[in-house]
Amino acid sequence: MYSSRKGLFVVIEGIDGSGKTTIAKKLVEKLKSMGYKAEYTYEPFASPFSQALKQYIDTYGGAEPEIETLAMALDRLYHIRKVVLPLLNEGFIVISDRYLYSSIAYQGARGIDLDWIYLVNRYAIEPDVAIYLRVPFDIALERKKQKESKWSYFEDIDRLKKAQDIYEKLVLLNKLVPVDASRKVDDVINECLNIIFDYLGKRKH
C-alpha cells in the first residue's frame, strides 16, 4: 500500500483550455478509488502573495512582469511549505494543477529572462512527474470560452500562444512529459496514470 511510502509530487501543466483542472481532479479521484492517498492542489494558490498580486492588478490595471514573477515565486514557496511538503511527508500523491513551469511559460511569455525565473524559484522543489497537456491552440481557445477564470488577466491570446511555444521547448528539454489532451478525458487520464505508475515502478528498484 502506498501510504507506507514517501509521497509523490505530480504536476499537470498546459495552457488555459488544455483541461488541466479536470484532469488533475479526476486523477485524484481515480487514485483514491484505487486505494492511494491522493490530494489535489493548485497554483496560483490562495496565499497572501497571490491575493496581493490580484489586488495590485485590480488597482493598476496590470502588473509589471518582474512584479508578477516575484509574486508568483512567493506564492509558490508558500504553497510548497504550507501545503505540498506536509502532504508529501504524510505519504500522499500530490497532484498540482500548475507549478513552476507555468511561471516559465507565462512570465517568460512577457519577456522575462528564463534563467532569472529559475533563480527566484530556486527553492521550488523538483516534481517527481511533470506532465504537459498538449492541445491544439484553437481547441484550447474554444474550451476556454466555456468557463470563467479567476485569472483572465493572464489569458490574452498573444500571451497564450507564446506560453504554448515555451511549453513545447520545455518538452524538448525533457522537463515535461507530453500527453495528447485533445482526446477523450478517460484516454488522457489513463495515459497520465501510466506515466505515474511507471515512475513508481522505477522508484521501487
Predicted regions and their residues:
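P-loop (Walker A) phosphate-binding loop of NTP-binding proteins
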Residues: 15
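A glycine- and Lys/Arg-enriched "phosphate-lid" helix/loop adjacent to the NTP-binding pocket
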Residues: 98, 103-165
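Hydrophobic anchor at the beta1->P-loop junction of P-loop NTPases
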Residues: 12
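ATP-binding Walker
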Residues: 18
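ATP-dependent small-molecule kinase phosphotransfer cores
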Residues: 36-122
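Walker A/P-loop
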Residues: 21
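NTP-dependent small-molecule kinase module
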Residues: 2-3, 26-28, 138-205
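Pre-Walker A (Motif I) flank of P-loop NTPase domains
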Residues: 5-9
